[in-house]
Every structure is written in C-alpha cells, then in structure tokens.
Amino acid sequence: MKARIRVLCVDDHRLVREGIALIISGTRDMEVVGAATTGEEAIAQFRRHRPDVTLMDLRLAGAVSGVDAIKAIHAEAPDARIIVLTMYSGDEDIHRALVAGATAYLLKDTLSDDLLRVIREVHAGGRPVSPDVKALLDARSGQRNLTRREIEVLELVAKGKRNKEIAVLLGMSLETVPVHLKHIFAKLDVTDRTAAVGVALRRGIVHID
C-alpha cells in the first residue's frame, strides 16, 4: 500500500486547523501528523515529524512569523515542501514567502479540491503557481523595492507616528525622515502618507496588527 502524504498544519486559528484536518481526513492518501499555532511550534513540529508537506500561514501568534519559520525550516531541510495558505494576497507577501523557501502560495478562499490537488502536486515535486499569483508577481517585477530602512519608516507612518517620533524611534535626524518619505512616495507612485500606507497595506509591504 502506498504511504500517505504526511501533512503538518500551521495556523493560529483553531477553526482553520480543524477545517483542514477535516478536509484531509476525507482522503485516502493523506493524513495530518501535526499542528502548530506559532512559528516556534512550527519549527519544532517539523523537526519532530518531518512531514512530506507543510501548510503554513504567514501571520502567526508569537515572535516568529510564517516567513521566518519557512526560512528556518528551509535552512535545516532545503528539500522541505511548504505551501503557504493565508488570507494575505499582496505581491510583497507572496514574494517574501517564495524567497524564504515556500513551494507554493494559496489563499484561504481556495476550494478544498484545489487545496488537495496542490498538496499532491507539491508532494510529487511540482511548484504550482495560480494565474492570480503569477499576475501579481509579473506586475511586481516592474516596481522598485523599498529598502529595509524605508520599510521601517513606512511601518511607523502606518502606526500614525509623526516625523519627530519616527526620527527618535529609528535613531535618525529629523531632517532625514522627509528624505526617506520622498523616496517611498516615488517608489510607490503616490504623493502623500495616507496613499503610501494604503498601497503598502494592499501589497503586503507592511501590516498593522
């Protein structure tokens, strides 16, 4: 008898984990071997179970994000097959996950049959990319990336911080903040802080918890 595909489910919402377990329990070729709610647990559970496929959300409880967990797992097991299953559809979210080592990227509104199909395809060595994800990545390829410092500034702008507060929190001069904002506006093709935050949230460049 052919061995079942062993799946690890990482999500901080119990209903999601239980829903995925229910979907997989209805198959003959898969089984859930472990579950985790945080990035730290995800890494530990991966080490313990060595699953064939891991389903990973991006936003998790705890200090270790989904992307960080993917990086850590991929560093230990370069052949790990990880499918991101999340509600975040921004091109930057997708890019960061794939660069970290994710094999595929799915949204939580994916039909159960499609989820099972992708699990099987990834287990077989495939790297499926949906048309929607491909379109977002293609559109992203023509855009300029923000620097780490610019993202830090933008994260604080998204939290409602003014220039003086940003300067203090990031240890920079007050005069430097507008320079960063000018570069951010140009790269995001906007003219003000509100528009910059809107674009950044939509694309997944920053998140507000």
Per-range role (PLM):
Residues 3-16, 20-24:
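Conserved acidic segment of CheY-like receiver
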Residues 35-53:
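Acidic, metal-coordinating helix/loop segments flanking the phosphotransfer/catalytic sites
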Residues 38-41, 62-68:
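Acidic catalytic/metal-coordinating carboxylates
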Residues 44, 67-79:
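Short amphipathic alpha-helix used as the core "switch/output" element in two-component signaling
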